[in-house]
Amino acid sequence: LFTDDGNGVQDPQLMRRAYEYASDLGVTMAQHCEVESLTAGAVMHEGSCCSHLGLPGWPSLAEELMVHRDIELVRLTGASAHFLHLSTAGSVGLVRAAKADGLPVTAEATPHHISLTDELLASYSALYKVNPPLRTIEDVMAVREGLRDGTIDAIATDHAPHVSETKEMPLDQAP
């Protein structure tokens, strides 16, 4: 298993080459799916809650574009991919379709992405600021369904410890 977790590989050509090598070696690539140019400065999920709070949003598309790109690279190279901490209904649908096509892909979700929504950030507490961000109830329900139907293969904590001072910072300044 090869990964650069925490930082999705932004360059499609570099990722293509990585998948080609992984295919030759019989190694699975694990990908944190985030198009960083779409998430720069984002604090929480882009939706009605972030609009109401006046905070910069993180679009679902930032995850879904990279999931789509990597599925197509798997199709091209014959490599296998594991998608880390899926959080959107769209991503679950993409992985479900890839599996139906017989592609060698797996995925995981976190406990918080199957149980918590972006509405918790109305408290302005940085305790709920995670990467990828908490999403809508519709996304939570889609991730749960993906777990039930086998689209999502595992639950993983994606534990990223922070000192308490960083979680006590204002939401827009916390990591």
Model-derived regions, located:
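Short acidic-hydrophobic catalytic motif
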Residues: 158
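Conserved nucleotide- and phosphate/pyrophosphate-binding catalytic cores
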Residues: 164-175
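Short intrinsically disordered, low-complexity coil segments enriched in acidic
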Residues: 1-6, 173-175
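Histidine/acidic residue-rich metal-binding segments in metalloenzymes
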Residues: 3-155
